[in-house]
Amino acid sequence: MAKRVSILDQHKKPSSARVRVAVRLRPYMEKEDEKAPAACVRGLDSQSLEIVNWRNQLETMQYQFDAFYGDSATQREIYMGSVCHILPHLLIGQNASVFAYGPTGAGKTHTMLGNPSQPGVIPRAVRDLLQMTRTAAGGPENENWTYTITMSYVEIYQEKVMDLLEPKNKDLPIREDKDHNILIPGVTQKTINSFGDFDEHFIPASQNRTVASTKLNDRSSRSHAVLLIKVQKSQQVSPFRQLTGKLYLIDLAGSEDNRRTGNQGIRLKESGAINSSLFTLSKVVDALNQGLPRIPYRDSKLTRLLQDSLGGTAHSVMIANIAPEQKYYFDTLTALNFAAKSKQIINKPFSQETTQSIAALPAMKRPREEAETAAGSRQRKKSKTDSTESSPNTSMDAASKRKLNLAALDPAVVERLLKLDKILTEKGMKEAQLLSTPKRERMALLKKWEESQMEIERLKEKQKELEQKAIEAEARLEKSTNSDCNLSDSSVSECTFRAPLRGRNTSTAKAKKVLRVLPMQGNSQLQSTIEEGIPVFEKKKKKPVSCDGRENQPTWEVNVRTDLLESGRERILKLLNTGSVKELKSLQKIGDKKAKLIIGWREVNGPFKNVEDLASLEGISAKQVTSFIKANILSIIAS
C-alpha cells in the first residue's frame, strides 16, 4: 500500500518547492559572428543579466534568476551551485529532476555530459549519489536499511520513446500509476553498485543516441535524452518500509530555425518533431502559470515524461543555456523568456513510501465484511471434511477470535503481542504471512487447495490403472513375440512386429505391421540374361531374422560377380575408344557435348587407358565418372 508523505510532517499539507532556474552563458566564439564583435548578452551579477532590446537599441532588458553563470564558469561551479543540493531528497523517497534547455549549439549536452577533463552534471550527480548511499548505509540510524540504485536511459526521437540501454526499435509507452507517478513499462533497468558499473552501461548507451550534423552544429542532438536514476531504500525488519526516489537528468534537443540550419529530408522531419515538443512544453508552462484547469501534458511525449518536474512532485532545476552571438539573438531571447516563466512554477514534492503492513486490525473491518465472514464460518462447520484438512481452518478461526479481542486488551499487552509478531516475522515463519491475509481470501485459497489435492488423487488413481494395463499388454506382446521367433526359417514367410504399449491409455494392441520378402525385380534385359543361365548376382549371406521390433531391415545381401564387372568395364572402355558420336550418346549420362569432347580428347591424346581417364576431360569430375560407371555397368553386362 503506497502512502504519500509530506516533506515536513505526514499530517500537514506538502510544502511547496519552486522550480529553480539557472542560466549559463556559453563562451563567445568570434569566428562564428560576422555581423558584430560585441555579445548581445551581458551578466550583471551572480543572479541577473541584461540583453539588448531589439525594439530599441538604446535600451536593455534585465532578467533575474536563481543563478547566472558567465562564460568563464566551470562545470564544477554550476554543479555545486545549482544541482548538488537536490540529491539528498532522493534518500528520503522524493523525486528530483535536472534538465538543460536552450537553442541548438548553446552547450546543453556539454553541460549535462561534459568531457573526461570537465565532467558534466550527469557523471558528477551519479558519483555523489553513490557516495551518499554508501555513507548513509554505514550510519547507525540506517542499520536495518539497504540502498539499491538502478538506471534507465531513453531518448524521445520523433515522438517515440526508445530504449538506449538495449535498443529494440520499439516505441515504449508512458503510463501513470494510481499514485500519479509517471513510469515507462518495459524499459531496461540496470543495477549500479559503483561508478564503474555506471560507465559500463552509460557510455555504450550514449553512442546509441541519434545525432547529426547541421549548418549550425557539427554534433546536433536529434532527440531528447532522459536518464532515470532510481534510489530505493528498503527496511529489512518489520514493518518493511520502502522509500523510492527518482532522479531525472534530461538533455533536451535544441529548437531550430530550418532557414538557417538548412535541414532537408529526414533532418527536417526531426526538426519539426523537436520544435513541436518544445512548443508543447511552453504551453504547459503557460497553463501552469495561468492556473488553467487543464494542463496539456499528454500533447507530447516530452511533457508527459516531465509531468513530475513541472507542476508535479519533484524538486526541479532548469539550466537554460544561451549563446552570446548576435545571430543567436532571438533564440537567446526566447530561451530567457521561457526560463523566466518556468521559475514561477510551483511543485509539491512528496516522499514515495511503500509499507508492507502486518495484519489489519479487526476494528477497521466493515460490519458487512464481518457478517460475510461469520456466515462463511458457519457454512464451513456444516460441510463434511476430513479431520486432517479441517485442522488449519480451526487454528485460523481461533487466531481470528483472538484478534477480535485485541482492541479491548491493555496497551502493554498489545505492545508485547506486536513485538512477538515482529519476532515471528524475522524468523520467516509461514504463519505470520498467513495471519496477515484477510479471512475471506484465506478461505478461498484453502478451498482451491483442497480441490487441487482431490484432483491430484484422481490423477494418481488413473495413472495406476493405465500402468497396470500397460504391463498386461506388454506381457501379452512378449508372449506372442517369443512364439513367433521360435518358428523355423524354412517355414517363415512373414515376421510380425508389434510396438510396445507402455504409456498408452488403452490396452488395445496396435495393428500388425508385416514385412514380406519380395523377389528382386530387374529390367527385361537382365531377366533374359538370368534365364539364359548366366548368373549375374551371387548370393553372399543371409542375415538372421530379428524380432526386436526393427522393421525394413533386408535379410539378404547380393554382390555382382567381379568377372562380369571387369568385362563390363572393358566393354565401356572399348566403346569410349572406338565409338562414334551416336554410339557414345547411347551411354547413360553422355550427351552430344560430352560425346564430342571424348572424340576430341581421343584424337589429341590417343585412346583411354581406363574408364577413370574421363576425369581428364574439361567439365567432368571424378564424382561424375563414378556415377557414369554405376549407371552403365549393368546395362553393358546385360547387352
Curated annotation (Swiss-Prot):
Residues reported to bind ATP: G102, P103, T104, G105, A106, G107, K108, T109
Predominant place of localization: nucleus
Family matches, as InterPro entries: Kinesin-like_fam, Kinesin_motor_CS, Kinesin_motor_dom, Kinesin_motor_dom_sf, P-loop_NTPase, RuvA_2-like
Keyword Protein biosynthesis (UniProt): no
Localization of this protein: Nucleus; Cytoplasm, Cytoskeleton
GO BP, one annotated term: microtubule-based movement
Lineage of the species this protein comes from: Eukaryota, Metazoa, Chordata, Craniata, Vertebrata
Post-translational modifications reported in the UniProt record: Ubiquitinated, leading to its subsequent proteasomal degradation.
Domain Kinesin motor residues, every copy: 18-345
Region (Disordered): 358-400
GO cellular component: cytoplasm; microtubule; nucleus
Residue ranges with Polar residues bias: 388-397
Function: Kinesin family member that is involved in spindle formation and the movements of chromosomes during mitosis and meiosis. Binds to microtubules and to DNA.
Family: Belongs to the TRAFAC class myosin-kinesin ATPase superfamily. Kinesin family.
Coiled coil (UniProt feature): 439-484
Keywords, alphabetical: ATP-binding, Coiled coil, Cytoplasm, Cytoskeleton, DNA-binding, Microtubule, Motor protein, Nucleotide-binding, Nucleus, Ubl conjugation
A GO molecular-function annotation: ATP binding
Chain positions of motif Important for regulated proteolytic degradation: 549-552
Full protein name: Kinesin-like protein KIF22
PANTHER family: CHROMOSOME-ASSOCIATED KINESIN KIF4A-RELATED (PTHR47969), KINESIN-LIKE PROTEIN (PTHR47969:SF9)
Pfam families hit by this protein: HHH_3, Kinesin
Gene3D superfamilies with a match to the protein in the record: AF1531-like domain (1.10.150.280), Kinesin motor domain (3.40.850.10)
